[in-house]
Amino acid sequence: MSAIAPGMILFAYLCGSISSAILVCRLCGLPDPRTSGSGNPGATNVLRMGGKGAALAVLIFDVLKGMLPVWGAYELGVSPFWLGLIAIAACLGHIWPIFFGFKGGKGVATAFGAIAPIGWDLTGVMAGTWLLTVLLSGYSSLGAIVSALIAPFYVWWFKPQFTFPVSMLSCLILLRHHDNIQRLWRRQETKIWTKLKRKREKDPE
């Protein structure tokens, strides 16, 4: 156990450091997401720049790079505390990727993937919370913030032994959304529908 957990933490960080948004944009001939759009190398920004197909590829990859290390460690019998550190390591890799100059995204999809091995019931509730918040508000960032705030309570209800590690993960996501929280408070955050409308007007078919 003592040897497996630190090794899985390193593996999770390296997996997280593979920035799918940057790679997909390069393959599709799109601008670097770190310097275009919102400047965030994540699925939402890629959706704005390259459309649904590219964004879906980024989303799936980002979820998997959080899910696979945690799932593997879970199957190996790693304790909840260490599982939390492994999940955080995957998100830290996404946020500060060693392979891409330590400039990454906000870790939402990767965090979602890291929480998924706890159970499909929890995964469905988390996805529903994010989707409902986005549909009602129009803000992708608010969906992430609300989901991060509620996640520890969901986990406490479904599998309380994972409450502490998920709480640590939620704190990391909220810290990464500090600027978004300020813009939401000042009513300066742009709705996702507005961003897509601007893209269609700029690049008409």
From Swiss-Prot:
Residues 1-3, 74-80, 133-137 are periplasmic. Keywords: Cell inner membrane, Cell membrane, Lipid biosynthesis, Lipid metabolism, Membrane, Phospholipid biosynthesis, Phospholipid metabolism, Transferase, Transmembrane, Transmembrane helix. It is a multi-pass membrane protein. InterPro entries: G3P_acylTferase_PlsY (IPR003811). Pathway: Lipid metabolism; phospholipid metabolism. Residues 25-52, 102-111, 159-205 are cytoplasmic. GO terms for biological process: phospholipid biosynthetic process. The chain crosses the membrane at residues 4-24, 53-73, 81-101, 112-132, 138-158. It is an enzyme of class 2 (transferase). It comes from the Bacteria. It holds the Pfam family G3P_acyltransf. Probably interacts with PlsX. Belongs to the PlsY family. This is Glycerol-3-phosphate acyltransferase. It catalyses: sn-glycerol 3-phosphate + an acyl-CoA = a 1-acyl-sn-glycero-3-phosphate + CoA; a fatty acyl-[ACP] + sn-glycerol 3-phosphate = a 1-acyl-sn-glycero-3-phosphate + holo-[ACP]. It is found in: Cell inner membrane. Its main location: membrane.
